[in-house]
From Swiss-Prot:
PANTHER family: S-ADENOSYLMETHIONINE SYNTHETASE. GO terms for molecular function: ATP binding; metal ion binding; methionine adenosyltransferase activity. Pathway: Amino-acid biosynthesis; S-adenosyl-L-methionine biosynthesis; S-adenosyl-L-methionine from L-methionine: step 1/1. Homotetramer. Induction: Follow a circadian regulation with higher levels in the light. It comes from Beta vulgaris (Sugar beet). Belongs to the AdoMet synthase family. This is S-adenosylmethionine synthase 2. ATP binds at residues 15, 167-169, 235-238, 246, 252-253, 269, 273, 277. Its cofactor is Mn(2+); Mg(2+); Co(2+); K(+).
Length: 393
């Protein structure tokens, strides 16, 4: 049996880039909670002792940007300079303007258009992917890397590993074989965890705790064997972290946000963007389409692409590839997808209920992945029934 190795990585909510994603989405949540028609393009950057939010926002909402920044940093665990940032003392810079009136009239017709007439907020192409290798219909390498990161945060916050600090990265290499286009995981080849820690803990303690409290609960035993390689804080020391260690910026972790290097990516980031931005809503609907193809048994693995022109409601193209795993030809599946899903931006917002704020909905997406999560707020993970006829054997 010929196998190959594939690797996916993840970063924790305390990673500077992810801190920025969460601030941008917390701002979006605050705007949508008061005004579902808010137009938001919010970027965040951070470095030692400073967080800046900037961009274009048009909203009726009354938003205290500085409070949102501080609350978000605090909830992640940035409560002193020692851990990389002090939410209460850091500088917060705000430079937010209204959306360009040129874009507003071209895309939204200044709110005069019916939903089905609303044009895409920008050009671009987005991909959705699904695979039958996990219950989430997501790639195993990505699922494990993401869950290890989420577990690191859990044991930091519940006190099981009190020496942990907010910043951290994970990476998992999985050995696969290709079953006529479908991906079948055989074993976990390598687990890498680099986590920020306090001064008091030894490398041996770190390794023992990570194995016991993080790796064991996350990686199913059947994937681990005596040959599995563990790199646990391989650089030795990681005390300085968060924005003190590295600068951070919204939209710099787009592969972690999606499929861990599987499938494809159109390049557009998600966080800080309202649903009229097809970078986000387009990527969400094609995930729903790809997931529905696999969940309905039409294929074991699928990728769906959609593309847009600014100001134009109808997509320019929709593409489906099932990597040779389709039960019926891809062109038939494409026809079913186009009949089932409405790819017009105004309709995607309605069908996926994307304008609903509150519940920290989009901030939840901004750490540990936008896809494969079991949460009712992740409406794009709901499988739609697809009508198709099985070809008799």
């Amino acid at each position: 049996m010929e196998t190959f190795l594939f690797t996916s990585e993840s970063v924790n909510e305390g990673h500077p880039d992810k801190l920025c994603d969460q601030v941008s989405d917390a701002v979006l949540d605050a705007c949508l909670a008061q005004d579902p028609e808010s137009k938001v393009a919010c970027e965040t950057c951070t470095k030692t002792n400073m967080v800046m939010v900037f961009g274009e926002i048009t909203t009726k909402a009354e938003v205290d940007y500085e409070k949102i920044v501080r609350d978000t940093c605090r909830s992640i665990g940035f409560t002193s300079d020692d851990v990389g940032l002090d939410a209460d003392k850091c500088k917060v810079l705000v430079n937010i303007e209204q959306q360009s009136p040129d874009i507003a009239q071209g895309v939204h017709g200044h709110l005069t258009k019916r939903p089905e007439e609303i044009g895409a907020g920008d050009q671009g192409h987005m991909f959705g992917y699904a695979t039958d290798e996990t219950p989430e219909l997501m790639p195993l390498s990505h699922v494990l890397a993401t869950k290890l990161g989420a577990r690191l945060t859990e044991v930091r916050k519940n006190g099981a590993c009190a020496w942990l600090r907010p910043d951290g990265k994970t990476q998992v290499t999985v050995e696969y074989y290709n079953d006529n286009g479908a991906m079948v995981p055989v074993r976990v080849h390598t687990v890498l965890i680099s986590t920020q820690h306090d001064e008091t803990v030894s490398n041996d303690e770190i390794a023992a705790d990570l194995k016991e409290h993080v790796i064991k609960p996350v990686i199913p035993e059947k994937y681990l064997d005596e040959k599995t390689i563990f790199h646990l804080n391989p650089s030795g020391r990681f005390v300085i972290g968060g924005p003190h260690g590295d600068a951070g910026l919204t939209g710099r972790k787009i592969i972690i946000d999606t499929y861990g290097g599987w499938g494809a990516h159109g390049g557009g980031a998600f966080s800080g963007k309202d649903p009229t931005k097809v970078d986000r809503s387009g990527a969400y609907i094609v995930r729903q389409a790809a997931k529905s193809i696999v969940a309905n048994g039409l294929a074991r693995r699928a990728i769906v692409q959609v593309s847009y022109a600014i100001g134009v409601p109808e997509p320019l193209s929709v593409f489906v590839d099932t990597y040779g795993t389709g039960k019926i030809p891809d062109k038939e599946i494409l026809k079913i997808v186009k009949e089932t899903f409405d790819f017009r931006p105004g309709m995607m917002s309605i069908n996926l209920d994307l304008k609903r704020g509150g519940n920290g909905r989009f901030q939840k997406t901004a750490a540990y992945g936008h896809f494969g999560r079991d949460d009712p707020d992740f409406t794009w993970e709901v499988v739609k029934p697809l009508k198709w006829e099985k070809i008799p054997a």
